[in-house]
Each structure stands twice: as C-alpha cells, then as structure tokens.
C-alpha cells in the first residue's frame, strides 16, 4: 500500500493544537501531533511531507521555555509556524524579538502584503479578521524573510521565506474566529507543500481491516461493547477482519437507560452477526452501590466491578490473546502531552486496568481518529443513525445522574424522565443539533400542587449542551415551547416528580455531567 501523506505538528502546549490537526485532516491530509521534545532525527524518520509548529503559552526568553531544534527546519519540507512557533522560529534563525507592552488576545484586522502563496484566493484589497493570543512578537524578521502581513499593533504579523518554503503567522489560522483560516491552512498544504488529499475514511477502513487481520492472524480477540459509537465501530471493523474469532461482551451494569441493553444487543446480533454475549450483572453492581453517595466512589465501584465481571467472562472463553479498545486520538495525544497529562477532574471509567490484569495485548484500531472521523467510519460501515449520532453516555451510566444514593425507585424515575427528554429532542429535530442532552435526578424534594392536593416530590434537572469536542460546552438555547413540553410531560407522566429545572451553566466552570 502506498505510503500515507503525513503532516507532523510539533506541540508547544497550545490549547488549540488539536484544532490544527483537525483542520489538516478536514482538508484530506493525514496529520499527527508530537510533543516539542521530539528530535529532528525522529521527525525525519516519520517521513513528513510538511511540518507545522504550534502555538504555546511560554515566552521564548524564559529559562525553561520549549525550544526548537534547528534540524527541524532543515528537513527539506515546508514549515508553517504559528504564534509561539513563529517567535521560536524567528529567534532561532537570527530575527529580533520583543515583548509586547500588553498581551494581545482576540480579534485583529490583518493587512496582507506581497505575493505570498498563503494568501492565494483572499481579497488583498481589504483587511481580513484574524485571532491573536500572544505576549511576545517578532520585531525584525530573520535574514531571508519578508514581512507579508501586519496589523495596527503588529508590524510583523506574518513573514515568509519562499526559497526555503518556511512561513510564519502570529495569529491562529486553526480557530474559527480567523475568517480565512481554513483557506490559509489549505494554501500551505496544497499551494506550498503541494500535498495529495489522500486521507479518507474509506481508505482508513480498508487499511485498518488489513492491518488487524495481519496483526491478529489466527488468534482470538475479546471486546467490551457498550453500545456507544466507539466500541461498536471497533467491533464491526474487527468482525470484518477476523470474523467469529472476535468475542464481544456486553455487561449490563444496572445503570443503563430504559431498555438500552437489550435493544443494543438485539440490533448488533441481527445486523452484524456478532459473536456477542449479553451479561446481565445488574444485581451485582447495584448491591455494591447500595448506600454510596460520593460520585468518585460510585465511579470506582462501577469500574472495578466491571473489570471483575469482564475478566471472568473473558476467561470463560478460553484462550484469548488480544483486548480491543476504542481509544481515540485525543486520548493518545493527552498521554504524550509535552507537559504530561492535565489534572484529573474526574476519574475516567474505561477498561484501562484490563490488559495488565488479563495479560492481553491491546488492539486499538481507532487510535488515529478524532470523534468526528469515527462517525464517518461508522457511516462507511453502514451503521444506523441511532448509533452514529447517539449522544455521549458515561461509563458509570445513570449512577452519576442520580445524585446521591442509588435505589431502584430513583433509577426508575430517572429512566422514565430521560426517555421523555430523548424522545422530545428527536421529534423536534434538536437531537442532532446539540452535543448532549439528558435528565438528572436531584437529591431533594420540593412542594407542589396537583389537583387540590399538596405534593412533596422529586426534582428533575435538564442538562442540554452545545459543544464540538466536550472540552468546552455551553447550555443549549432550546425554544421555550420545547422546554415547556418536556417539563409538562415529565411532571404528568413520571410518578414522583413535581418540578423540572433547566441547567444554564457553561463548561468551564461547570462540567457537563453533574457528578
């Protein structure tokens, strides 16, 4: 198979480095992010077609600031430096830096200068809006560089060395706020680097199936199915590669949504002929959760119990060599961050403890992909919309949406309320417009009036948010008529609820889930 065209992105700690990778991939070119400690020899061995230097929060003059190995600029491939990357490049090649009197954050109007290929197709007679986020700046470009962009406060907002195909911009072309950002990145990829747009999900599927078949050979793989898109795509890809030597296990932990377990199992068995075991372990999980109110304790109990159950079921299969997981590219990036993983806000429920416990080799077919790419792969595989566009659902399930103690009665109330939320979002056309929507059962009761009588019953909170990647989120501005209909149905149809409230908190400072 012909080698994949590849762009290497060097990460200097910007919060939006992943956006660079996504913009490149959206253009049909494969990209990888590597920490700034990577060496020029390591990058050379990756055979990149181009290199992009990301932004970052540091100042080039700081003692512990990330550095740039000069060899990265001598690979003979085009280079695009962004923000901190531009300052680092300017410093290394003999330019002069200065500290801005005030840090510049937000929009700026860029004047395009000269005949720079980055500006191809952009109207040069007017300014274009870009997004800035910097403290330092390049005061004098290095030898061989021409100034190709300026703003009212920045004489060197962009510079270019056409002979060496090295370009630098002080703004962030990867963010949506930069009006011509996508065009600028595409101009770098196709007009400067002259790359091929050969990264497609159909080519990924073909390659993934071939590689998994070669890796597994005649051995067996076990896969934990949750019914979510990631594990389902992993299972279907593996099934195409190795057939019945894939063993899927779906564990019902007792905190799934209404009828969810049986519906998922029935669909996957019927449409994909998966070798699938449905383990009904509800009682085992709920007994361990009895009386537990602390959310972190709930997560740990569910995680540890899942590992116990899954381990028992996998051992019962006999000899299995591989464990399949739905690891995505953001997980991989986080694990090799230039500063190490970020602070843990909540423990993540996954099967991370299984490979060591079971002595299995990991197989992670989606580790190159972002979430939106997984959805495209699902489409290539013929998965239905209800799986492709299913809202994210936490591993601990409803256990962290029942605030406080978990009981059968409280789970029943939440399941019925959540079913109404999902149904109304779908029937109104809002389900695919929002990132996530669900109900939360609060640990309190309030006074109400129904008919001629006083009530003292439970409160349901609605959490419906807009997001791109769950890193940040904002509450969804749903029509008041839709919110009214959801509230009315829950109060009238779910016994034990007399009040519905709408969560209008953003992330940050709040998280999407309540626990």
Swiss-Prot record:
* Residues annotated as binding ATP: 226-232
Q: In which pathway does it act?
A: Purine metabolism; GMP biosynthesis; GMP from XMP (L-Gln route): step 1/1
Locate the active site. 83 (nucleophile), 172, 174
* One MF term in the entry's GO annotations: ATP binding
Kindly indicate whether the keyword ATP-binding belongs to this entry: yes
Q: What class of enzyme is it?
A: ligase
Q: What is its EC number?
A: 6.3.5.2
Q: Which reaction does it catalyse?
A: XMP + L-glutamine + ATP + H2O = GMP + L-glutamate + AMP + diphosphate + 2 H(+)
Q: Which Gene3D superfamilies match?
A: 3.30.300.10, 3.40.50.880, HUPs
Q: What does this protein do?
A: Catalyzes the synthesis of GMP from XMP.
Q: How does it assemble?
A: Homodimer.
Q: What is this protein called?
A: GMP synthase [glutamine-hydrolyzing]
Please report the organism this UniProt entry assigns to the protein.
Nitratidesulfovibrio vulgaris (strain DSM 19637 / Miyazaki F) (Desulfovibrio vulgaris)
Gene of origin?
Answer: guaA
């Amino acid at each position: 198979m012909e080698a994949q065209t590849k762009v290497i992105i060097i990460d200097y700690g910007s919060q939006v480095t992943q956006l660079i990778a996504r913009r490149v991939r959206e253009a049909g070119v494969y990209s990888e992010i590597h920490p700034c400690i990577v060496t020029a020899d390591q990058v050379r061995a990756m055979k990149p077609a181009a290199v992009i230097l990301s932004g970052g929060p540091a100042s080039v003059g700081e003692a512990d600031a990330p550095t740039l190995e000069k060899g990265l600029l001598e690979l003979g491939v085009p280079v695009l430096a962004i923000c901190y990357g531009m300052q680092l490049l300017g410093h290394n090649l003999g330019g002069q830096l200065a500290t801005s009197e005030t840090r510049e954050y937000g929009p700026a109007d860029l004047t395009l200068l000269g005949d720079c290929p980055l500006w191809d197709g952009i109207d040069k007679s007017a300014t274009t809006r870009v997004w800035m986020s910097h403290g330092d700046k390049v005061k004098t470009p290095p030898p061989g560089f021409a100034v190709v962009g300026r703003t009212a406060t920045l004489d060197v907002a962009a510079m270019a060395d056409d002979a060496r195909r090295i370009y630098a911009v002080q703004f962030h072309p990867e963010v949506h706020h930069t009006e011509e950002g996508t065009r600028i990145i595409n101009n770098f990829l196709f007009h400067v680097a002259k790359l091929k747009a050969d990264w497609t999900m159909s080519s990924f599927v073909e390659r993934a199936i071939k590689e998994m078949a070669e890796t597994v050979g005649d051995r067996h793989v076990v896969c934990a199915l949750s019914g979510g898109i990631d594990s389902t795509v992993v299972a279907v890809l593996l099934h195409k590669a190795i057939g019945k030597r894939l063993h899927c296990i779906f564990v019902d932990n007792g905190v799934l949504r209404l009828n969810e377990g049986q519906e998922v199992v029935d669909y996957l068995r019927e449409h994909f002929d998966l070798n699938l075991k449905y383990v009904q372990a509800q009682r085992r999980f709920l007994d361990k959760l009895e009386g537990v109110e602390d959310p972190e304790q709930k997560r740990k109990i569910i995680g540890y119990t899942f590992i116990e159950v899954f381990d028992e079921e996998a051992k019962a299969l006999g000899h299995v060599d591989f464990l399949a997981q739905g690891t995505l590219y953001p997980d991989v990036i986080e694990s090799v961050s230039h500063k190490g993983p970020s602070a843990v806000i909540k423990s993540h429920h996954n099967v991370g403890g299984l490979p060591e416990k079971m002595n299995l080799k990991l197989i992670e077919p989606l580790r190159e992909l972002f979430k939106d790419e997984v959805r495209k792969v699902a489409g290539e595989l013929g998965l239905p919309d209800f799986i492709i566009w299913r809202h994210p659902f936490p591993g601990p399930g409803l256990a962290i949406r029942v605030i406080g103690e978990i009981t059968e009665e409280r789970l029943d109330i939440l399941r019925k309320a959540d079913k109404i939320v999902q149904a109304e979002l779908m029937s109104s056309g809002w389900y695919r417009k929002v990132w996530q929507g669900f109900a939360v059962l609060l640990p309190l009761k309030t006074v109400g009036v129904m008919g001629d009588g006083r009530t003292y019953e439970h409160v349901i909170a609605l959490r419906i948010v807009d997001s791109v990647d769950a890193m940040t989120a904002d509450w969804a501005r749903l029509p008041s008529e839709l919110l009214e209909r959801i509230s009315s149905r829950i109060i009238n149809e779910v016994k034990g609820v007399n009040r519905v409230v709408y969560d209008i908190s953003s992330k940050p400072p709040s998280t999407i889930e309540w626990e």
